[in-house]
Amino acid sequence: MKIIVDMMGGDNAPLAVLEGTAQAVKEYGVQILGVGNEELVRRTAADNNIPLDGIELVNCTQVIEMCDEPARAIRTKKDSSIVVGLNLLKEGKGDAFVSAGSTGALHVGASLIVRTLRGVKRPALATMVPAKKQAYLLLDCGANVECRPEMLAAFAVMGSCYVNKVEGRQSPSVALANNGAEESKGTPVLKEAHQLLKTTPGIRFVGNIEPRDVPNGEVDVVVCDGFTGNVILKLTEGVAKMLLGMLKQMFLANFGGKIAYLLLKGGVSDLKHQMDSEEYGGAPFLGAKQPVIKAHGSSKAKGIKNAIRQAKTCVENDLCGTMQSALDELAAANKPEE
């Protein structure tokens, strides 16, 4: 299996990307097609004693920056690591693409270069979010700010497939993020989406879920538009950071706190591990014809390695093929009777 990796994407590129890809080659047995400034990548590898075994490099001269307008960048920076990498994926030179680069550029590129599955207007950005009982899949978490009901139904189908194939959960539960549990709550779009989800084949829809209940992790998939999802995601990250900071302050405040920390050290370490987003890899663009994984922009080696593991799992389980079959079933169910 060959995974295409953007060597120039993210705050810590190319060093962290190199370290993560080298670890992935060793641990997962994958081949890497690294796209980026070859001279810089080779020099960084040599300076840090990082082996390039199993890593083939493809040179490119441009990088899409976070400040670039996504659609314009995809059109004009043809020799950027993202555009070159996505084209290599489209051409069958690799099985999946991983990048910690611009989310907007990846969304546009996944739509225009890799293209989308039948029944998908635009790919949804999905991510596993830590929660009390178990992590849940949140989609869309930022790619599509406004969504029609049929888009939310497609998200539900794809999210259910992902949690089943990649996370290994049987008959995953799907909920619609809303401001109330009752069917009558929400905007007209959410009310219509609720009715549509009740009759969507292939998913186990459990109704609306209020934001206060989302962190409990009682459902496997939470469906929403990209604006709502991004708010949920960033609020979760902020609250987690705040709580860990408050715990640290409490433990360091006095001698008693330090003693308490020694007694609770194992539990605190487990909590930090559970809340570490790098453990979950990256955020897939569900709905692209081939796996495109967005690693966090601040990813270190572990995050890159786990994003590659995630891409490998998607390919091994034919996630895109499974989603296409489920989407075709959805389209057939919603086809008007003649």
Language-model features: where?
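Short helix-capping segments at alpha-helix termini
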Residues: V25-Y28, A46-G54, E167, L197-I203
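Phosphate/nucleotide-donor binding subsite
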Residues: I50-G94
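Short glycine/serine/threonine-rich phosphate/pyrophosphate-binding segments
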Residues: A13-V17, V41, D79-G92, A96-A110, ...
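Short, glycine-rich nucleotide/cofactor-binding loops
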Residues: V5-P14, A143-A153, K294-A301
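N-terminal phosphate-binding or glycine-rich loops at protein starts, especially the Walker A/P-loop
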Residues: M1-R42
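Glycine-rich phosphate/nucleotide-binding loop
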Residues: S111-A124, P130-L138, E218-V222, G226-P336
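Glycine-rich phosphate/diphosphate-binding loop of Rossmann-like nucleotide-binding domains
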Residues: L15-A16, Q31-L33, E39, V145-G207, ...
